[in-house]
């Protein structure tokens, strides 16, 4: 009888633990991507609690690599960071597309992400949010049309960029090169990065600072210390709301486009909740909540009528006629390129 009671107790504890796991979804994502009101609505509809960990691309890869893909049920890396990490570390599992309402996704974004996250015929990412990097300028003080304008003599000490790979890509495109087309040629890519590094070193006196976070740049532009900078679209539109002279513009050489995704960690323990969350968040009314929270645009269908008219007007001013053809979308990064870029960025940082 005693053994029976012990066995029954152990079984009950196991069932309780399993139930607890089934009632929790562990997400690792970016700030503002998973707003509290969306979590509450999901809990009300499904009974599933959401445990959120804030992170970024580098941390997501590091955490999932350290655990072999355990600890989370859903991750939200950028599309260009998935394949290299999967090839090298195996930190994700393939997505079962039959469990998703694919009609809720805008076809063009679904196509881009599937192309850049498919390995051996299996899909590892789905689109969530997108945005661009371009130029922000105080048009009352100066005019700029492309990234090299940040290096003009009259703007010495008055511009800013982030010392990260997007800046390398931006200046490469501005030089008339396509860095993405050279991903398969490490020698040519390295030569291009060296060229861009030399350009940034020659321009270094123009940079008031290399910004590390959004507040540093936003405050620098608000104060007038910085009059033009490489910046993300929503930051520019935020500044524009308080000062119409500050505008986000698409550079002559094109904007850089990013797409953040849904991805399933390899050892996630609640795929059912992850699929439920994806289907839930891609409904137009729920995608609109996310847009309101983060200020970026969703890959969900039918959100346009639900977006703040002011945000739509700002987008239209930056992208006339909804022209997205000038956007250079980040493709998957092959292994080894980021180390090459890192050495170039280190040289720029160390240069006098």
Language-model regions: role of each:
Residues 7-16:
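Bacterial N-terminal signal peptides
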Residues 23-85:
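Early extracytoplasmic/lumenal segment of secretory-pathway proteins
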Residues 76-218:
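Extracytoplasmic ligand-binding site segments that recognize negatively charged/polar headgroups
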Residues 193-203, 242-266:
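Periplasmic-binding protein-like
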Residues 256, 265-325:
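Mature extracytoplasmic/periplasmic domains
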Residues 321-352:
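Conserved C-terminal helix/tail region of periplasmic/extracytoplasmic solute-binding proteins
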